[in-house]
Curated annotation (Swiss-Prot):
InterPro entries xrefs: Ribosomal_uL14 (IPR000218), Ribosomal_uL14_bac-type (IPR005745), Ribosomal_uL14_CS (IPR019972), Ribosomal_uL14_sf (IPR036853)
GO molecular function: large ribosomal subunit rRNA binding; structural constituent of ribosome
GO CC annotation terms, alphabetical: cytosolic large ribosomal subunit
Gene3D superfamilies the UniProt entry points to: Ribosomal protein L14 (2.40.150.20)
Primary role: Binds to 23S rRNA. Forms part of two intersubunit bridges in the 70S ribosome.
Family membership: Belongs to the universal ribosomal protein uL14 family.
GO biological process: translation
HAMAP family in alphabetical order: Ribosomal_uL14 (MF_01367)
Keywords, in A-Z order: Ribonucleoprotein, Ribosomal protein, RNA-binding, rRNA-binding
PROSITE patterns associated with the record: RIBOSOMAL_L14
Underlying gene: rplN
Protein name: Large ribosomal subunit protein uL14
Length: 122
């Protein structure tokens, strides 16, 4: 469950290291985002010579949450930290590599490019 002011790690090589959620997209009263949801983030920490700079406002897809993700078969999956992948306006990743595992739920949300770049799909 990601809400406003939540800090997330960045799971790609776009140059950002840490971002903060400033808006959950998908309705005016929507409070929380889960795996596969799109949020608006502000870059809080970035590496030098990266594609993005500190202070940039971008969209991101949530790829890992510490809150359980319940599946249809009754199993749950959870991660140690919250993480996101930065995307552009065409919903394509800004980076060229994805770090760490991503859940299968991204496939149902049509984030196929992230699925194909990920080293492991759980």
């Amino acid at each position: 469950m990601i809400q406003m002011q939540t800090n997330l790690d960045v799971a790609d090589n776009s140059g950002a290291r840490r971002v903060m959620c400033i808006k959950v997209l998908g309705g005016s009263k929507r409070k929380y985002a889960g795996v596969g949801d799109i949020i608006v983030v502000s870059v809080k920490e970035a590496i030098p010579r990266g594609r993005v700079k500190k202070g940039d406002v971008m969209k991101a897809v949530v790829v890992r949450t510490a809150k359980d993700v319940k599946r249809a078969d009754g199993s749950v999956i959870r991660f140690d930290k919250n993480a996101a992948v930065l995307i552009n306006n065409q919903k394509e990743p800004v980076g060229t590599r994805i770090f760490g595992p991503v859940p299968r739920e991204l496939r149902a949300r049509n984030h196929m490019k992230i699925i194909s770049l990920a080293p492991e799909v759980l």
